[in-house]
Regions:
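Small/aliphatic-rich secondary-structure junction motif
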Residues: 2-48, 130, 155-156
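Short, well-ordered secondary-structure micro-motifs
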Residues: 17, 44-47, 90-92, 115-116, ...
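General small-molecule cofactor/ligand-binding pocket signal
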Residues: 33-35, 78-82, 133-137
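A glycine-rich helix N-cap at a beta->alpha junction
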Residues: 55-78
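Structural beta-alpha unit
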Residues: 72-103, 121, 141-156
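Short, acidic/small-residue loops that bind anionic groups at enzyme active sites
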Residues: 106, 124-139
Length: 156
């Protein structure tokens, strides 16, 4: 069973990525995994759950909405929580563990677009070795020119 993974980020980004992922999952009968990353406050406690704040009411409401979106598309959906120290390491480990073929990830903006492009390139290289495609929903400089979309390579 193919797996499409969506990293939970801000509500708008996650909703847009989720709609795109659901459309892809419905067309390919893939399973959708929503990856909820929680930064570990103490790397020594990683994986123990100690020191991780409980979900807020707003987060619970968001997860309910995300589940309803997946149900509207008729897509199998699951939520996967994960503690992490570095974002790139967590994304790579999640893809490797769950054998995801597609990952929608929100790589944080940094002051320099060159640095962000390098980070995206590096993450793409890691994921490529795992046979996983990365989609980031990058926006052009003018926000009014942007709409959420995915360009898929031609099937050979």
């Amino acid at each position: 069973m193919a797996i499409i993974m969506v990293q939970v980020s801000n509500r708008l980004w996650t909703t847009q990525a989720l709609h795109l992922a659901c459309a892809l999952a419905r067309g390919s009968h893939a399973h959708l995994v929503l990856l909820h990353l929680r930064r570990a406050k103490n790397p020594g406690l990683l994986g123990t759950g100690i020191g991780i704040d409980p979900l807020t009411d707003a987060e619970c409401d968001d997860f309910t909405e995300y589940r309803l979106i997946a149900e509207d598309y008729g897509v199998r959906f699951s939520l996967q929580p994960m503690e992490y120290v570095t974002l790139a390491g967590a994304l790579t480990q999640a893809v490797e563990t769950l054998e995801a073929g597609i990952l929608f990830a929100d790589v944080p903006e940094h002051g320099h677009s060159l640095w962000r492009r390098f980070q995206n390139w590096q993450l793409r290289q890691r994921l490529s070795s795992l046979h996983c495609h990365l989609y980031t929903l990058e926006q052009p400089p003018r926000a009014e020119d942007w709409s959420p979309s995915v360009t898929m390579p031609a099937i050979k």
